[in-house]
């Protein structure tokens, strides 16, 4: 099935570019984010951050020039208003947080890691759904097929694909970001921990433990998702504090 964003851009799988196969860490997130625009009509901002295109790279750090390229490509009919780049803080925040609060403290660069998501495509979150119902549906006659986050984020076939990427990366260390990679990936191979709170309760936040996957041995570290540690949207102050202490202890 072909999925599309509002205003018609295709939803693409966003995956790591296979630039080398000797990475130090394999980092697994949840699902791909998107390029966001500001939607203005009759001089008023009606949606400050509408997802309209797939990011150009996994854990993208934002780029107004690229956002403008997307806007030019959409070429919105003026009867629907106009699109402008969303605030810089709303494009690529997870990617910037990943660099600043995960890679930098570990003295890693993007060249040292292989990035992956349980679901490599963007999905509609409740905020996007609300905005579309209020301002798009029945008012803009450009079809879209933007599915919500599924109950099962990664099925068995997707887990197999992730394992293939893991082996391709050459990494022997794995970082899992948040509850979902524990639930949908780690628990296929090790059921010691069910969620990040279990990790933290055992004083294992940010500490490596061994896991065997497909006969290969890895060191796994579980950390909170950048949404939590970077205070991006809905988040729990607890995980920022826990993550801050982890950084201080490195």
Predicted regions and their residues:
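Active-site and ligand/interface coordination hotspots across diverse enzymes
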Residues: 1-104, 161-165, 209-216, 242-250
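Feature marks short, surface-exposed loop/turn motifs that line or immediately flank catalytic pockets
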Residues: 34, 122, 230
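Short, surface-exposed acidic-centric catalytic microdomains
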Residues: 59-67, 88-142
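Short, well-ordered beta-to-alpha junction loops that form the rim of enzyme active sites
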Residues: 30-32, 118, 176-181
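Proline-aspartate-enriched helix->loop->beta-strand connector
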Residues: 162-182
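A structural signal for well-ordered alpha-helical segments within the folded catalytic domains
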Residues: 92-96, 179, 183-184
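Hydrophobic/aromatic beta-strand patches that form the interior of the parallel beta-sheet core
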Residues: 26-28, 114-116, 173-175, 219-221
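C-terminal capping/extension of enzyme domains
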Residues: 1-9, 45-58, 82-83, 128-160, ...
């Amino acid at each position: 099935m072909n999925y599309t964003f509002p205003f018609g851009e295709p939803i693409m799988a966003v995956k790591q570019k296979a630039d080398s196969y000797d990475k130090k860490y394999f980092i697994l997130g949840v699902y791909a984010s998107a390029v966001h625009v500001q939607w203005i009509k009759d001089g008023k901002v009606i949606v400050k951050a509408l997802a309209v295109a797939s990011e150009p790279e996994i854990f993208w750090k934002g780029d107004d020039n690229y956002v403008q390229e997307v806007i030019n490509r959409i070429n919105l009919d003026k009867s629907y208003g106009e699109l402008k780049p969303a605030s810089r803080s709303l494009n690529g925040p997870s990617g910037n947080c990943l660099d600043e609060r995960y890679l930098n403290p570990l003295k890693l660069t993007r060249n040292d890691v292989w990035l992956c998501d349980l679901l490599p495509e963007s999905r509609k979150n409740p905020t996007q759904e609300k905005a579309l119902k209020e301002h798009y549906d029945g008012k803009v006659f450009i079809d879209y097929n933007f599915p919500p986050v599924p109950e099962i984020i990664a099925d068995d076939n997707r887990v197999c694909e992730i394992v293939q990427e893991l082996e391709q990366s050459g990494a022997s260390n794995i970082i899992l970001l948040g509850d979902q990679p524990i639930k949908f990936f780690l628990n296929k191979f090790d059921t010691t921990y069910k969620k990040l709170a279990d990790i933290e309760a055992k004083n294992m936040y940010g500490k490596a433990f061994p896991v065997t996957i497909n006969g290969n041995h890895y060191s796994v570290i579980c950390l909170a998702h950048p949404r939590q540690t970077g205070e991006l949207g809905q988040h729990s102050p607890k995980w920022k504090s826990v993550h801050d202490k982890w950084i201080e202890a490195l």
